[in-house]
A protein has these predicted regions:
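Conserved active-site and cofactor/substrate-binding residues in soluble primary-metabolism enzymes
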Residues: 2, 6, 27, 45-48, ...
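Anion-binding (especially nucleotide phosphate/pyrophosphate-binding) glycine-rich loop
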Residues: 2-135
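Phosphate/pyrophosphate- and phosphate-bearing ligand-binding catalytic cores of soluble enzymes
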Residues: 21-22, 73, 160-162, 166-284, ...
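Structural signature of FAD isoalloxazine-binding scaffolds in flavoprotein oxidoreductases
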Residues: 35-36, 42-47, 74-92, 140-172, ...
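Short, flexible micro-motifs
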Residues: 38, 71-75, 110, 136-141, ...
């Protein structure tokens, strides 16, 4: 706790223009509308500022938790009094590269990324137009829907590696993408900064029509009018979580103000004043009942944040390409290092 206070004081002194919220309730920063106060929430305006914050935290043997759009996360009611969160909400640069690929920073919403691709006659991200997440968060979990996944469109990512305070570029293959998984979930100390997406040329009107069709399908089937963290459970191999939950008779099952959606059993919704404890108990009950009914052990898809988060100071798990060229500095991807 003492180290955290020192780091906060240092950051305030060195970065007076930084948006820094203290003891901020995280219920206001996630789609579930659940969560107590975090000790500090920083919202840097660019990658250079983000890297400076990370540097000051590392000086005090601390690591931040990186928050995207907060659309697949459950914060604890008790809050996170020893945690420093960095939001990527303002990291929203996006443009076409000379070779036709799309460059997007971590805070760009997936909906805006898909729309930008459509406007430029590029197909392959139609599935992402209705996913309420960001590029950074989406890549960490390899977000997908309707048969598409981000791994199918991404070419490379740039990350800031906290233990070494360096920028690295990873190819798609190095990211080890799997179903709702990636290298970044297993490797501590990674902060995704940006990505390049390689898409195929297509017809803009046809792409827009497909996006409208998928979004209408989403509105028809999903409880978009209630707070949630998206799909509560990962899809088990050869089956669907929603179908298993429905067959177990749990559609509409409720604990406090947390409820298995009556519209789509794969969602847990906040009916008004749900607590994280309500959600924990409901998910435990659902997993137990589904296992008893079908023998399938459901695995949570949403991120359930623990009360503590520490930097694991271990080396890169894969060979990485170090970036330190002046061009990266000009593009806003540079690491200040001090």
């Amino acid at each position: 706790m003492e180290n955290l206070e020192k780091a906060i004081a240092r950051i305030k002194e060195a970065m007076p223009g930084l948006e820094l919220l203290e003891n901020e309730n995280m219920s206001a920063h996630c789609s579930f509308k659940i969560g107590g106060p975090v000790r500090a929430l920083a919202v840097p305006s660019d990658v250079s500022s983000l890297s400076k914050i990370c540097y000051f935290l590392k000086e005090n043997q601390l690591a931040p938790y990186i928050l995207g759009n907060g659309t697949n996360i459950l914060f604890p009611d008790e809050g996170l009094k020893e945690l420093f969160i960095i939001s990527t909400a303002k990291l929203t640069k996006m443009f076409l590269l000379p070779d036709g690929a799309i460059y997007a920073e971590a805070g760009v919403s997936l909906a805006k990324l898909a729309s930008f691709a459509q406007q430029n006659g590029l197909k392959g991200l139609e599935f992402a137009s209705g996913i309420p997440g960001s590029v950074g968060g989406g890549l960490i979990m390899n977000a997908g829907a309707y048969g598409g996944e981000l791994k199918d469109a991404v070419e490379s990512v740039v990350l800031y590696y906290l233990p070494e305070q360096r920028l690295y570029e990873l190819t798609k293959e190095q990211c080890s993408f799997g179903y709702r998984s990636s290298l970044f979930q297993k490797m501590g100390g990674c902060v995704l900064l940006s990505a390049v997406f390689r898409l195929e040329k297509g017809n803009g009107e046809e792409i827009a029509a497909e996006m409208r069709r998928l979004n209408q399908q989403r509105r028809d089937k999903q409880p978009l009018d209630l707070p949630s963290a998206g799909s509560a459970f990962k899809r088990p191999e050869g089956n669907y979580a929603a179908a298993l939950i429905d067959r177990a008779g749990l559609k509409g099952y409720r604990v406090g103000d947390a409820q298995v959606s009556e519209k789509h059993a794969g969602f847990v919704v906040n009916m008004g004043k749900a607590s994280s404890h309500d959600v924990h108990r409901l998910m435990r009950d659902v997993r137990k009942k589904v296992y008893e009914n079908s023998g399938v052990a459901l695995e949570p898809e949403m991120i359930i944040l623990p009360p503590d988060y520490r930097l694991e100071d271990k080396g890169p798990a894969v060979p990485l390409h170090f970036i330190s060229s002046p061009k990266q500095e000009e593009d806003g991807q540079g690491h200040s290092g001090s």
